[in-house]
A protein has these predicted regions:
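C-terminal structural segment of proteins
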Residues: 1-163
């Protein structure tokens, strides 16, 4: 069992470079525990930190189906974790964009969401400038490079989602 990973385990761990948190956040998932239901928007609270109580267990994750969605990531070559990953989900109520690998925790890119809700095209994603102010700088990439990658990967995700 120790060699197996689960979606619930990945969400509970909330590694800042993990892929599943981006899917949960962009799709607007609901994390179901042994005692409550938590919207993804309220679940991820910081680096390796979630809204789970110490003795709370994830029992299910409910993912709404988007009209279109796609995930693109720029991988760290050694770990294959996301240096930056962007999940784009076009839903009936608008577009949600979640970014992983760039900050202390997965987050929504609201400027990209607004641009893509108005025009779901790669050009609209590329036209957005992302601030590096809240992004990570480490031995793998600067905050500025991560800020550059976010709209590039969002544009690729839109291309994939549009088929």
């Amino acid at each position: 069992m120790r060699a197996l990973g689960t979606i619930g385990g990945s969400l509970a761990n909330n590694d800042p470079a993990a892929c599943y948190p981006a899917a949960a956040l962009a799709l607007g998932a609901t994390i179901v525990t042994d005692r409550r239901r938590i919207a993804a928007d309220d679940f991820f609270v910081g680096m390796y930190e979630t809204a789970l109580a110490p003795d709370e267990l994830i029992t299910a994750v409910e993912f709404p189906v988007a009209e279109r969605s796609a995930y693109e990531k720029f991988r760290n070559p050694a770990s294959h974790f996301a240096l930056v990953g962007v999940f784009v989900a076009k839903r009936t109520d608008g577009v949600r964009v979640a970014v992983t690998g760039a900050g202390a925790s997965v987050f929504r890119a609201t400027d990209l969401e607004s641009a893509l809700t108005a025009d779901f095209t790669p050009a609209a994603a590329r036209a957005v400038t992302v601030s590096a102010d809240e992004l990570n700088t480490d031995m793998h990439a600067s905050a500025e490079y991560r800020a550059h990658l976010i709209p590039v990967l969002a544009a690729r995700a839109v291309t994939t989602a549009n088929g």
